UniProtKB/Swiss-Prot annotation:
InterPro entries hit by this protein: G-protein_beta_WD-40_rep, Kinesin-like_fam, Kinesin_motor_CS, Kinesin_motor_dom, Kinesin_motor_dom_sf, P-loop_NTPase, WD40/YVTN_repeat-like_dom_sf, WD40_repeat_CS
Swiss-Prot/TrEMBL WD repeat ranges: 1506-1546, 1548-1587, 1589-1628, 1636-1673, 1677-1714, 1805-1842, 1844-1873
GO cellular component terms, A-Z: cytoplasm; kinesin complex; microtubule
Spans traversing the lipid bilayer: none
Compositionally biased residues, Acidic residues: 280-297
Protein name from the UniProt record: Kinesin-related protein 8
Binding site for ATP: 93-100
Originating organism: Dictyostelium discoideum (Social amoeba)
Feature: compositional bias, Low complexity: 232-247, 473-567, 937-1005, 1182-1200, 1244-1254, 1348-1358, 1423-1454
Coiled-coil ranges from the UniProt annotation: 715-933
Disulfide linkage: none
Record flagged with keyword Repeat: yes
């Protein structure tokens, strides 16, 4: 037996199984989506939108069962447990992912069998295997259960646990154990299950928001198996005698099997002596013993094994923000996450693939107790399975992704499992092996049988042996202890190397046979090849050790007794052994030579293999290219070229790798007399060729290369470019080398030149020195001969000669030097230039080389990236192709199913058709038979039943036949219908009972008679009632169908919003927080449930009604079954019914909007302040009018108001019909009837109203003509001059003139009939108050003429019709900038908030309307969408009011022009009032007004100072009115507490804050400014945290929010729009994609329908609120930038830098008739009105007195006091003018609806720019650059001036009680009445 085996196969990797649980009920309720996708047929999953793919060993979806997981993953681990390996199952995942359910660590009581986890199934499986192995093994089972709670180890099976937990210890071999842990012995599966239940009940659990039964600790349940074969030794000591006897018994049993080895190849070697034959026999015996070892059972090799199975149920990771854990739960979660973090670090370190190639990395096992306990399971002695449990819900996306990453990384962990043998048993096996080895050695050396040896050994007295092994060689002991038991079985015939000497054969050396078989022959050869010295030394030491071990026994015996025969034998053998050792040394050297030879062969084979692999790859590339590019349309040349490529590759000369190897081997063997068995050569060559299994890796690489051959073909261009770069680099390097050589040549030339120069200079110096020396010698000689004068001359001559000589020589040298320098100067300069150029060239070449190499590296990187992309694309395409194939297969299956269904339906249809034909035939027979039976009955039954008929009146004799025929028809119809309904029944009975005759299926005579009597009792219009019933049912069905469709659409909207919300939440990064997502999803889910309930209810109702309704085929069938004589009656009833329905529909449309109630009382008016009305009533004193109103109001309570249609044409018809009916009633009853026309409109929230005394209306009349005087003429002259100037300015500025009418010479007005007036008045509405009369009685139709015709203006006759018109529908008129800026309203309060039109007997009409005062809230008016045809003029209307003389008792205060002359407003644009704004007296008056005790006057109550710069914007939180937000140029946003006046918080901004807005629904505030950003602040949080920042292309000037949208106006004239629900990116809308303004956006506001924008380009644009489509551009524009916009009740007010304020409203046409004005002054007003005549009416005939003012009012200006010429023109006017005007108005009304027009212009509203506008309590407040604040009434007719700030007013805002203003003087002021 041997030591434990190290398993090195692929199964040692940690196996990972992924289990995805199904969605929980909570997740389904939250409508969570599954984010985990599966790959069919592959253990892969795909996560998220990025399609991240993870591959595991096993993948189980939510539908997998527990049994599947056990069979696929766990069963093989149980088998490994009984083989002696440790096993571990590790459950990993987040909390609530199903780990405990999968492992089964909970109690098994009450759990169904199919839901049992892994542990209960393992227990059953273990005991099943124990039942099978109990006969051969002795098994002991133990269990332990522990938990790790808060880093404390607890024993779950110990009833008295240790305080503080159990420690962790480590053995010397690195194994971790826990001392004190209870290992309970279990003897049955019930005991083991009880231990599991008891431990699971003691485990710590808790409840969190994510899991109600969350495990709060890590649990490890362990099963320990100790198995011992029954026949194996279990004791730790045995005597040598028992060992030898057992060995001899084994040997004797094995000798019976030696015969089959007699023909071994070893016997073929020559054997010449006995020794050789003995050696062969011994070799045969060794082979047989090896075979015995091979067949030795596992039980005998592993006698005592202890293995463990660990089940680890980890606590799930959790996030505090999801679990909302606190206190102890929070501490538990922190400890759990800490342990799992350490586990993740261990997995990451072990799973790092670089550990195999780099330095081993530290594994942080000691960071946590959990990792220390799992040390053996992760990277140690265990076979481990990790079950990763995840949740598929998108809400757990991040946790699922992290779990998959760790699990995927765990697959790279390599374990080292070994068979766990008991160490005592292992030592015994070692001793047995040594004893057996010694016996074999003695048997070979002594040539004796094993029995003789045993007897000799038995006769030797035993001596105590020390515990050390018998063999003293440490190598032998180490080999025996370290090598595995399987090495004994690896010896085979194919691995034997037989070497023969000269005289004797050599099978196996004694030394090698004496060694234990530690390795197979393959590995031994390789080892000897690599380390021959070690082999030699080991063999020699082993032989010497064996000899020394053999000599120990004789030494013992010699000391105790005389020499025995055994000692003699041993002595002789020792000499032989010495000789054999020498022979072994020779053999070792010979094996070394063979090893070298085989290594050379291996190298050659490797090279040949590479060549063949290259050729194979080329062939596969060519074939793959042929497959990819194959097309039947290819030319023959293409195929020829392809075959040539094949032939060229195949014809390359190659040599078989086996042939040269065999040849070389045979050559070497023949030369060295060594014979190698060919059968053993091939595996040896394979091992030597590619050690370590590299052959398989090369094959794999070849496969990969084949798979990537397509990618290589795609990179041909890049390869060519790469080769060009390489060539370019080589060329540049050669050029650089050449230039470097040139530089060296230049250096050499320079050195030669310098050397030459130096030589010449040295020569010159030498000559000079020689000259000086010669002259010195001559002077010395001359000094010696001073006295000899004869020699003086000689010396002089000699000196001259020497001087000349040396001078000549010096000159020659200098000439040579100059010549050398001059000749080489050009060359030198040229060399210098060449040097400089070469250096530059070198630098450039080096730079080019660097650039080229960089390009090369970039290209290589690009090629790698492209290759990777293409591989990914191929994988994706392959997956898509597989998916498409699967879809195609599914589609084919569906098509086949549909075909089968179609065939079945065709067969069924054919069958039904045949049955129908048979039924028709039977029906015809029944009809014929019925007619035969009915005819004799009719003559008897009809007269006898005339008295019982239920019709209105008895049947006359004259038409008795008709009644009879009708009854007969009814009877036949009923019979046919009844027979048709019972057709199936009768036919079935006929087919089932063939004996029944045909007469049995038809009704009897008594039945027919009874049915006929029943039909005669029904009224004649039976078909009519039936048709009405069917029509009603079908109408109800259609209504329910439409309702159902609407509910479905609403549900689709909510579902779409829920999907968008879920995408926004699951996107990375998430756009919504969890709380926001839960809140919005809960709201959408509630709506969806509500819609489902509505849909279910509608479907039930529709089903009930559908059962009663007959469809078209059924109706046609009933009609076809009706007799011919009944058809005329049916057709007549149908046509009459259609006509009646059409007539009823027409009348309903006409009277749909008609109601005749009396006016409501004053109290009801106060309760319904959202609408105002016009009354048309006869003129009477005020007291009588009020009494009449009270009388009418009492009668109005019992009337019902009908709904009015929104269409203008329907409104005209309704008013005409109402007035005509009213006049007809006056003619009959001579009573006063009132017509009230009220349009039901959506009610908008109104302004706060004052007391009822302030709501009394005033009746306006013009003053007497004598009060006007010269002031009127002066005013008109000034208007005329001003108008001419403005017309010139308009022409210069590009504006066309208003109309082509001569303004001061208008045509003569044409009188307008009352019908035309009423038609036009009903078609339009107005908000201005006018009074006009008409006197042309001949033009009034008879239906409008009163019964009592009088001409007295004071007539109190109540017979005149009263028309009540809702003031909600009246629209304000349009003001042009050229009109007079005056107040035209008086202050009379004679009416109760109603506009009254009085019609007297002379058809004099007076219209009265209450004014609006700046001191009271403005009444909310909702304008009717009407046509902007005519331009209104309030001043002209005031002149028309002045012509009415009915209200002479009014004071002069109602005179507009008198008030204009007496009390001019300070902001009038008349020059004589402009200078008052700058006078000191005026300012003093304002200051005095500040202190007066008037409740309606605004005062400054508080001032805030805190900004370091000017105020730019203010905003008030509507949800929290006590908080004010301010932004300024100091880059701060300040929060002010309005209760205390304190600055609560400062919010910093990157730039000046120009605009603020608050969205109440989301609780967010948006700020914009000069840094091209929009910040979002959460004002609901305590610190107003900044949520996000949006980038904008330009600075933000203004912000506005409504609904879910936020709109920002930018400085570049564009807009940005965000949806609050998805604020990641701005929306792309028509507003943002198309430029609508050319200048900066200064201001924005919102109406009920439109988004209003004002810009620097002087324009105002209207966009639809939801679609952001341009609706209208307001004309005419301002003359400078629009700085501010305010909206009051959908009326738009705009302020501009041109110091004006404009009022814009929906335009309308109001036709007012005035027949009584005859004043010259009114002619002037008429002239002024004519100036503003609408261009569309410019073609009015010249004799028409019809004038349209700027309030869209048509005034027929013919008064009773006109001159005779005007009367003549009026009397001669044709009536065709009125009809043409009416038709033109009607036609133009529909084309110009919903258009905003300017109806008020306020020039010089301020002395400087109008910076801001604000609405407060129904008034308009404006702030200007002149530091003033002004308050205006809604009509901009009067104002109140507030002394504002010390500097420019920059912003205004308001609440219900206060007005807030901000200025550039850094102050905020609060104003209150």
């Amino acid at each position: 037996m041997s030591s434990p085996i190290l398993n090195t196969d692929d199964n040692n990797c940690v196996r990972v199984a992924l289990r995805v649980r199904p969605l929980s009920k909570k997740e389904e309720a939250e409508r969570s989506m599954e984010v985990v996708k599966y790959v069919d047929g592959e253990p892969q999953v795909i996560m998220g939108d990025n399609n991240q793919t993870f591959t595991f060993d096993y993948v189980f979806n939510g539908k997998s069962r527990q049994q599947e997981i056990f069979d696929d993953c766990v069963a093989n681990l149980v088998d490994c447990l009984f083989e002696g390996y440790n096993s571990t199952i590790l459950a990993y995942g987040q909390t609530g992912s199903g780990k405990t359910f999968t492992m089964g660590t909970t109690s098994t009581i009450g759990i169904p069998t199919e839901e049992l986890g892994v542990i209960p199934r393992v227990i059953d499986f273990i005991y099943d295997k124990i039942d099978r192995k109990k006969d051969t093994h002795q098994l002991v089972l133990k269990v332990s259960f522990l938990e790790l709670y808060n880093e404390e180890i607890r024993d779950m099976l110990n009833p008295y646990p240790t305080a503080g937990g159990l420690p962790i210890r480590e053995k010397s071999n690195g194994e971790v154990y826990i001392p004190g842990l209870v290992e309970q012995i279990v003897r049955s599966r019930q005991q083991m299950e009880e231990a599991l239940i008891r431990g699971s009940q003691s485990r710590t659990t808790g409840s969190t928001l994510m899991n109600s039964h969350s495990s709060r600790s890590h649990a490890i349940f362990s099963i320990i198996v100790e198995q011992t074969p029954i026949n194996s030794p279990v004791t730790s000591s045995s005597t040598s005698s028992t060992s030898t006897s057992s060995s001899s018994d084994d040997k004797k049993q094995s000798k019976g099997k030696k015969k089959k080895k007699s023909s071994s190849p070893d016997s073929l070697s020559p054997n010449k002596d006995d020794d050789s034959s003995i050696m062969i026999d011994e070799d045969e015996e060794d082979d047989e013993e090896d075979e015995d070892d091979d067949i030795m059972s596992m039980d005998e090799r592993n006698p005592s094994i202890r293995s463990m199975f660990h089940f680890v149920d980890l606590a799930g990771s959790e996030r505090v923000k999801k679990t909302k854990a606190e206190g102890q739960r929070l501490k538990e979660g922190i400890n759990i996450n800490g342990g799992l973090l350490a586990l993740g670090n261990v997995i990451s370190a072990l799973g790092d693939t670089r550990r195999a190639t780099t330095k081993p990395k530290h594994i942080p096992y000691r960071d946590s107790k959990l990792t220390r306990m799992l040390q053996s399971s992760l990277g140690g002695n265990s076979k481990t399975l990790m079950i990763a449990c995840v949740s598929p819900a998108d809400s757990n996306f991040e946790e699922t992704l992290n779990t998959l990453k760790y699990a995927y990384r765990a697959r790279n962990i390599m374990n080292k499992p070994v068979v766990n043998i008991d160490p005592v048993t292992q030592q015994i096996l070692t001793y047995k092996t040594q004893i057996q080895t010694l016996k074999e050695l003695l048997e070979k050396c002594t040539c004796r049988d094993i029995g003789d040896i045993n007897s000799i050994l038995a006769s030797i007295p035993t001596v105590s042996i020390p515990p050390a092994p018998p063999l003293s060689t440490p190598t032998l002991t180490n080999n025996n202890n370290n090598n595995s038991s399987s090495n004994n079985n690896n010896n085979s015939n194919n691995n034997k190397l037989n070497v023969g000497g000269n005289n004797s054969g050599f099978s196996r050396t004694p030394s090698s046979s004496s060694l234990p078989p530690t390795n197979s022959s393959k590995s031994s050869i390789v080892k000897m090849n690599n380390s021959r010295n070690i082999s030699s030394s080991s063999s020699s030491s082993s032989s010497s050790s064996s000899s020394s071990s053999l000599t120990t026994t004789p030494s013992i015996t010699n000391n105790t007794a005389t020499p025995s025969p055994t000692s003699v034998i041993v002595t002789n053998l020792s000499k032989e052994k010495e000789k054999e050792i020498f022979d072994l040394g020779m053999k070792v050297s010979q094996l070394e030579f063979e090893n070298n030879m085989l290594q050379d062969i291996s190298n050659k084979i490797t090279s040949k293999y590479k060549a063949l692999a290259n050729r194979s790859r080329q062939l596969e590339e060519i074939s793959q290219n042929f497959i990819n590019n194959f097309s039947p349309n290819k030319d023959q040349t293409y195929f020829n070229e392809l075959f040539e490529q094949f032939n060229s590759v195949l014809n390359q000369p190659t040599i078989s790798p086996i042939t040269p190897m065999m040849a070389a081997v045979s050559t070497q063997i023949s030369s060295s007399n060594v014979i190698i068995n060919s059968n053993s050569l091939l595996p040896m060559a394979e091992d030597n060729l590619l050690p370590g299994g590299k052959l398989e890796s090369i094959n794999n690489n070849n496969n990969n290369n084949n798979n990537s051959s397509e990618g290589i073909e795609l990179f041909e261009n890049d390869s060519e470019e790469l080769s060009d770069l390489n060539q370019y680099i080589s060329e540049k390097e050669e050029e650089l080398e050449l230039i470097s050589k040139t530089k060296q040549q230049y250096q050499q030339m320079k050195e030669q030149f310098d050397q030459k120069v130096k030589e010449l200079q040295s020569q010159l110096e030498e000559v000079t020195v020689e000259k000086d020396q010669a002259l010195k010698e001559l002077d010395k000689d001359k000094d010696k001969d001073k006295d000899n004068k004869d020699k003086d001359q000689y010396y002089e001559d000699e000196k001259l000669r020497l001087t000349q000589h040396y001078e000549k020589k010096l000159n020659e040298l200098k000439q040579q030097l100059d010549q050398h320098a001059g000749s080489n100067k050009k060359d030198y300069q040229r060399l210098l230039d060449l040097k400089r150029k070469s250096e530059e060239k070198i630098d450039s070449l080096q730079q080019d080389i660097k650039d080229t190499k960089r390009q090369k590296s970039d290209l290589l990187k690009k090629m790698r990236d492209e290759l990777k992309k293409r591989d990914d694309a191929k994988q994706t395409q392959a997956k898509e192709l597989d998916a498409l194939k699967r879809e195609a297969r599914k589609t084919e299956v569906i098509i086949d199913q549909l075909k089968n269904q179609s065939k079945k339906k065709d067969l069924l249809l054919q069958k039904k058709t045949d049955e129908s034909e048979s039924y028709k035939k039977k029906l015809k027979e029944i009809e014929v038979h019925k007619q035969r039976v009915i005819q004799p009955i009719n003559s008897k039954s009809i007269p006898s039943n005339n008295n019982n008929n239920n019709s209105s009146g008895s049947v006359k004799s004259s038409n008795g036949s008709t009644a009879s025929s009708a009854s007969s028809a009814n009877s036949s119809s009923s019979s046919s219908s009844s027979s048709s309904t019972n057709t199936s029944t009768t036919s079935t009975s006929a087919t089932n009972n063939t004996t029944t005759s045909t007469s049995t299926s038809t009704p009897t005579t008594e039945q027919l008679n009874r049915k006929l009597l029943h039909r005669k009792s029904i009224n004649v219009p039976y078909w009519r009632e039936w048709l009405i019933h069917q029509i009603q049912k079908n109408l109800e069905k259609n209504e329910l169908t439409e309702l159902l469709q609407r509910e479905f659409k609403n549900k689709e909207i909510f579902v779409r919003q829920a999907n968008d919300l879920k995408k926004a939440f699951t996107s990375v990064p998430s756009k919504l927080s969890k709380s926001e997502y839960n809140e919005q999803s809960q709201f959408l889910e509630t709506n969806i449930k509500l819609q489902n309930e509505k849909i279910l209810k509608s479907q039930k109702d529709l089903t009930i009604i559908s059962n009663d309704c007959l469809d078209s085929p059924e109706i046609l069938r009933m009609v076809s079954n009706t007799s011919f004589d009944k058809l005329p009656k049916l057709i007549q009833s149908s046509i009459e019914l259609c006509i009646e329905y059409a007539e009823i529909n027409r009348k309903n449309q006409q009277i749909k909007f008609i109601n005749v109630p009396t006016p409501p009382t004053l109290q009801s008016q106060q309760q319904h302040q959202k609408s105002q009305h016009f009354y048309i009533q006869p003129p009477q004193p005020l007291q009588s009018q009020q009494q009449q109103q009270e009388k009418q109001q009492k009668q109005s309570n019992s009337e019902q108001v009908l709904e009015q249609r929104s269409s203008t044409s329907d409104l005209l018809e309704g008013i005409k019909l109402a007035i005509s009916e009213s006049n007809n009633k006056n003619n009959i009853n001579n009573n006063n009837n009132n017509v009230n026309i009220a349009k039901s409109q959506p009610i908008l929230p109104s302004q706060q109203q004052l007391s009822s005394s302030q709501e009394l209306a005033e009746e306006y009349t013009s003053p007497s003509t004598s009060s006007l005087g010269m002031k009127l003429d002066q005013l008109l002259d000034e208007i005329k001059l001003d108008k001419e100037k403005r017309e010139k300015n308009k022409l210069l500025n590009g504006y066309p003139p208003m109309s082509g009418i001569n303004y001061f010479n208008p045509p003569t007005p044409q009188p307008l009939s009352a019908s035309s007036f009423l038609t036009s008045a009903a078609a339009t509405t107005t908000t201005t108050t006018t009074t006009t009369t008409t006197t042309n009685k001949q033009q009034v139709p008879k239906s409008f003429a009163p019964l009592n015709n009088t001409n007295n203006n004071n007539n109190n006759n109540n017979s005149s019709p009263l028309l009540l018109i809702s003031d909600d529908k009246l629209d304000h008129s349009v003001f042009d900038k050229d009109l007079l800026d005056v107040d035209i309203l008086g202050n009379d309060s004679s009416n109760n908030g109603f506009s009254v039109i009085n019609i007297n007997s002379n058809n004099n009409i007076t219209i009265k309307k209450p004014p609006s005062s700046p001191t009271r809230p403005h009444r909310k008016t909702t304008s009717l969408q009407s046509s902007p045809l005519s331009l209104s003029l309030e001043s002209g209307l005031a002149t028309a009011l002045a012509n009415n003389g009915n209200n002479n008792n009014n004071s002069n205060n109602n005179d507009v022009f008198t008030r204009l002359a007496s009390q001019p407003r300070p902001d009038s644009r008349l020059k004589k009032y402009r200078d008052k704004l700058n006078t000191d007296d005026y300012l003093m008056a304002i200051k005095r007004n500040m202190n007066r005790e008037d409740e309606n006057f605004m005062r400054c109550n508080w001032t805030f100072n805190g900004h370091d710069g000017g105020l730019l914007t203010l905003v008030l939180d509507e949800q929290n009115p006590s908080t004010l937000y301010s932004g300024g140029s100091d880059k701060n946003i300040k929060l002010w507490d309005l209760h205390t006046g304190d600055n609560m918080l400062d919010l910093s901004s990157p730039g000046p804050v120009r605009s603020l807005c608050i969205n109440g629904s989301s609780g967010c505030m948006f700020s914009g400014g000069a840094e091209r950003t929009v910040k979002v602040w959460d004002i609901r949080s305590p610190g107003n945290t900044n949520l996000c920042i949006f980038k904008t292309p330009s600075d933000v000037n203004c912000l506005v929010t409504y609904g879910n949208y936020v709109v920002s106006g930018l400085e570049n004239g564009t807009f940005k729009v965000w949806d609050i629900r998805h604020m990641q990116k701005p929306l792309k809308t028509p507003l943002t994609t198309t430029p609508h303004h050319t200048g900066t956006i200064f201001s924005m506001s919102v109406t009920s329908k439109y988004l209003v924008t004002g810009s620097r380009d002087h324009t105002i644009n209207l966009f639809h609120r939801d679609s952001f489509v341009l609706a209208q551009k307001l004309q005419p524009p301002h003359h400078d930038g629009v700085t501010s916009i305010a909206v009051l009740d959908d009326v738009i007010y705009s302020g501009s830098r041109d110091r004006t304020i404009k009022r814009w409203d929906v335009s309308s046409i109001n036709n007012l008739i005035n027949n009584n004005g005859e004043n010259n002054s009114n002619n002037l007003i008429t002239t002024q009105l004519a100036q503003q005549t609408v261009p569309i009416l410019s073609n009015t005939p010249s004799n028409s007195n019809l004038i349209i003012n700027n309030n869209n009012n048509i005034i027929n200006n013919n008064n009773n006091n006109n001159n005779s010429s005007n009367n003549n023109k009026s009397s001669s006017a044709p009536s065709s003018t009125t009809s043409s005007l009416s038709s033109s108005l009607d036609n133009s009304t529909f084309s110009l609806l919903n258009q905003y027009q300017q109806n008020r212009l306020l020039n010089n509203a301020h002395n400087d720019w109008v910076n801001c506008l604000c609405i407060h309590n129904g008034m308009i407040f404006s702030g200007g650059k002149d530091s003033n604040i002004k308050g205006w009434d809604p009509l901009l007719s009067s104002n109140s001036l507030l002394l504002g700030h010390e500097s420019s007013i920059s912003c205004l805002t308001s609440s219900k009680e206060f007005l807030f203003s901000g200025s550039t003087d850094k102050c905020i002021k609060i104003w209150k009445c």
